[in-house]
Regions:
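Short, compact, well-ordered microdomains
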Residues: 73-106
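N-terminal disorder-to-order initiation segments that are Gly/Lys/Arg-biased
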Residues: 1-38
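Low-complexity, intrinsically disordered short peptide segments enriched in small/polar/basic residues
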Residues: 4, 59-62, 103
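Short, conserved turn/kink motifs that form compact alpha/beta structural patches or helix kinks used as
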Residues: 25-86
Length: 106
């Protein structure tokens, strides 16, 4: 397994690593990025909360490392402008797909 870091930067004053996502090393780069993106989004529950009984967004491959918000509210979804670290290279969530920090499409 390979560990990716999800870094929220789009709406924060400073970058914050919010999760580590374990992915199969044999996946392509785009598949790794898409997996990390999908499983740090709130679609059918809360990706960052483990205490919900019916939580379609829970995935044991995702480890939340940022604290929950006051009152136990979950973390926001990964959005355009956020970053995913694969190995030692960061990729940015783009309007469609992903880009390098230099703006090259993946």
């Amino acid at each position: 397994m390979e560990k990716l870091a999800v870094i929220h930067t789009a709406f924060e004053d400073k970058p914050s690593t919010v999760a580590f996502v374990d992915v199969d090393e044999s996946l392509s780069l785009i598949d790794k990025l898409e997996y990390a993106y999908r499983w740090t989004n709130n679609v059918m529950g809360s990706w960052s909360r483990t205490d919900l009984e019916d939580n379609g967004d829970y995935n044991p491959a995702v480890t939340r490392v940022a604290p929950l918000h006051e009152g136990g509210m979950g973390l926001r979804s990964t959005s355009v402008g956020d970053q995913i670290l694969v190995g030692n290279k960061k990729y940015v969530v783009a309007m469609m797909g992903f880009e390098t920090l230099e703006g090259e499409k993946i």
